[in-house]
Amino acid sequence: MTDEGDLAQEDTAKDEGNVTEGSRMSKLRRARRKVTKPHLCSMDGEEIAKANSSEMSRNQIADLSKPGSAESWSSHSAKDAYHPTPVVKPSLPSALAGAPDAEFSPNTDPTRYNAQSFNPPQLSARMKHIKQEMAKNHLQFVRFEATDLHGVSRSKSIPAQFFQEKVIHGVFMPRGYLELMPNPKDNEVNHIRATCFNSDIVLMPELSTFRVLPWAERTARVICDTFTVTGEPLLTSPRYIAKRQLRQLQDAGFCLLSAFIYDFCIFGVPEVINSKTISFPASTLLSNHDQPFMQELVEGLYQTGANVESFSSSTRPGQMEICFLPEFGISSADNAFTLRTGLQEVARRYNYIASLVIETGFCNSGILSHSIWDVGGKTNMFCSGSGVERLTLTGKKWLAGLLKHSAALSCLMAPAVNCRKRYCKDSRDLKDSVPTTWGYNDNSCALNIKCHGEKGTQIENKLGSATANPYLVLAATVAAGLDGLQSSDGAAAGSDESQDLYQPEPSEIPLKMEDALAALEQDECLKQALGETFIRYFVAMKKYELENEETDAEGNKFLEYFI
């Protein structure tokens, strides 16, 4: 929204840790330069890499162990509390930790949650794997992808021969690609030095997300984090915000196990697309007969590292549901982000339009099913172990936090006018708000506590719509839950034996987008957790969208581009 000079001045007190990000990125570049050179410069350089691996590792370890280095990112110290990388499972198999040329499998990679927190042997093994994948699949291009505020993938495709250089130095992209809004001088956010609003940003790839795309010919993708040209993280980046909240959760002694459940609609595509001719493919009419499309999508998602637990037809014609397997850390949001792009590309191969947009009469949900575990990922902190429908005190505190902030959460999780219709779809009364409901094993509630044994004890946050940015849904959920955990007396959670929660005032969800935006602006906890810079920008963007809301006909005209 503004240039980073302003952001640094305005948010220094609330976004501690950003000062050292520039030096960390510089260290990371140096480490990548050392490790990637023997693997990617030449297909014949493998013997040189092996001969020099011991000396290279010693030098890199000495360099990376310095304060502020890439290796120090996995530290649990308080001064690093705001670093965006959650280290959920820090232990490494001896084979990978001991040898640069150890076998690497992307689907069993133990460092997949420790993004960019690699030591030299890990980084070397990962780069070797990437080189092998590029050669085996004859890759010609690599997409460097980042999410915008709406959760849409924005990318630059790089010829494969330049991949090594871009891993080290990053890919430059105009900032306006990710922050889709006119110049802040003409809007709510007006700062003195906003002239740099249209400056470039840098996409730095997270190598753990490198995958060959089965639905794109000879193309791979890597998900990127966004930085300014001076090395600071972009404070409006949804992925950065999500990582920062996960790190806060880890510092509190927990980690997040989560998965998204999405509904989406499949439309048939006539020769001319308009609001009257878009139709449903008959084969998807409350059935699973359209297997080839769904099977190709699910198999493709698996190849990109996103494991699908199940898929089925949903409640309405042409509406499908897809459920991901739970994963620790940022992976669940990465999987949802991958789905949003892959769904579109696979659908076009079948001459379909697949849309996450909520049309009149349809309720495309984006549920975040989640639980918190101890930092080692061994114990579900929501499970009482009694075999009855009951949350632990920790679980009830977390739930109390979600209820407390539900009004502000709804703004981030149902970010469009049509999204909010689902909150009152069963009511004919004209209201300004509806209660935030919760219950045990009750799918009609906004917050549904599923007690299906120890591993199945989880909270389904059903406030979200499929159009919400998955990184923001995850970040806001963690921020609200953490506030509940950190409540001083725990009175809101009630006793450990009780199933009930004590609420001084019933939680309400605003039905109007304007009221939800006001609730978000007034929620000091979420403002501090997500950053005032982000909140200021998000609110200004939504107000601009409300002022320029398109008609249904215009929306249908460009339906194939919406997700």
Curated annotation (Swiss-Prot):
Q: Which PROSITE patterns match?
A: GS_BETA_GRASP, GS_CATALYTIC
What tissues has this protein been observed in? Expressed in lens.
Chain residue ranges for the region called Disordered: 1-115
Return the SMART domains for the record: Gln-synt_C (SM01230)
**GO MF annotations, alphabetized:** glutamine synthetase activity
Purpose of the protein: May act as a component of the cytoskeleton or as a chaperone for the reorganization of intermediate filament proteins during terminal differentiation in the lens. Does not seem to have enzymatic activity.
What is this protein's record name?
Lengsin
List the gene name: Lgsn
